[in-house]
Amino acid sequence: MDPVASAGRTSRGRVLLVFPPAFFRLASGHLPNTGMEMPYTFPPLGLLYLGTILGRAGFEVEVIDFAGETYQAERLVAAARRADLVGFSVVRNNRDKVTALIDELVAAGVERPIIVGGPDVTLRPVLFAHTLATVVGEAELTIVDIVERILTGGDLAQAHGILFRDPATGQERTGRPPKLPAELDDIPVPDRDLCDRDHYSLFGPRQRGKTAVVITSRGCPFRCSFCSRIALTQNTYRVRSPENVLAELEALHRAGYRFLFFGDNNFLIDRKRVLAIADGIIARGFAFRIVVAGRVDAADPELFARLRQAGVFLLSMGLESGVQGSLDFLNKGTTVERNGRAVRLAHQAGLFVHANFILGCADETEADLLATRRFVLELPLDSIFVNVLSYQYGSALWAEAHDRGLIADGELNTTATSEHGLARLPEARLRRALKDLLLRFFFRPSYWLRLAMKSARSGEYDFMRLVARLCVQYLYAEVGNTLRKKATQWKARIPRRHEERA
């Protein structure tokens, strides 16, 4: 980069922040050709936080979210040429895209310092080819210093939370330890105008421009053995005050947002705080429709009723299994009975209830798969996601399996199957069990009748439309997988037929 290019500007420099194309798999268990890919439906909140902080510090910031809009190489290259520095956000399922986009810039002859950051490289910091640095950890307290040092040629070894390539030697070096924001109330509310809000909607095109993500806490005090998220937050749990949260919600309401997704790992941990936020929403007359996630420990008729009054219509819970031994293996700290009670209480309060389930825990048998299936089908659940257990880098399960020599250093996401020595049941059986559970759950006439009646009672039809759309897309994906498999088998038989004729 030519330092003269920034001369005469009133800003401290121009920064481009990019979220590459990314999808998450619905009901896949990370097994190939299982489930379907779904696009991200929310703006990149992490980049918006950092972009806001950089903007307040005097930098000109542009954010491009290619997960929310169609990727255009020309737009990326043009924006990078306007910038003094380019940053990419790395999550588990866009790492290859990040590499491809960086290669795109290099091929176009764009010579700008490139940095990456995000949860994937926080868990396992690495330097990407053609990049100068990797930002590690929550960067609200460090990003301004890092960008300033890069643009002015400062000493990166003195920056916090950074892995960088020494310009003089080309060697990898680390800076000082990351800084974790202790007081979340001190972090400015993200400027959502940095992204085009019309790209995002959880409930289809009718609600575009009205959907926002809000984070009211970071981390989690629980220690589920399969979860790697606690490693991202250095095993801490921090919260924003109800007053701080309500101030953000008031600004969102004035701006016309009506659908909120509370992205906390567990919004319901602190009952007193949750009730204060709910009461504040009710008192201010906010007309939000809200999605939250929480553990079954918080199940309480009064709490659920108050949340419903505040506009919460969908509650997501991680039930994981209908087998107590599997819950203990996952270190959930709950019981099958408590899980069932939580679902019934939420249903009675008029909440739509979504639950996540995991198949393939170490000692699960055929009988256990059937027990989980019975448990799922007996509950008044409104939607489910099902996955096969994955040993993810950063989780306690991964560390234990790695210590036992069952997972190699480079295996960051290993599916629990008998082939990997991590479960009793083979991949093929777990794949069938996953598909069977989804089909039995979603394609019951009684399920759709109950969901329709619940929607009519609440006047909330968007959720049922979303589920219907996902079911159609799932069937389409499964039909496509089947046809591709048949085509491959057919092509494989063609040479043999020619040989037989010869």
Task: Name each model-derived stretch.
Residues 1-17, 55, 59-60, 396-402, ...:
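Radical SAM enzyme core and accessory elements
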Residues 2-12, 21-30, 156-159, 165-216:
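N-terminal [4Fe-4S]-dependent radical SAM core
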Residues 14, 84-85, 261:
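Structural motif
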Residues 24-29, 123-126, 222, 272, ...:
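Flexible glycine/acidic-rich beta-alpha junction loops that bind and position SAM and/or redox cofactors
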Residues 29-45:
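Glycine- and acidic-residue-enriched helix-capping/strand-helix junction motifs
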Residues 46-181, 388-394:
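Glycine-rich beta-alpha loop elements in corrinoid/cobalamin-binding modules
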Residues 126-144, 304, 309-315, 371-386:
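Structural recognition of alpha->loop->beta junctions
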Residues 190-354, 361, 374:
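Radical SAM [4Fe-4S] cluster-binding motif and immediate context
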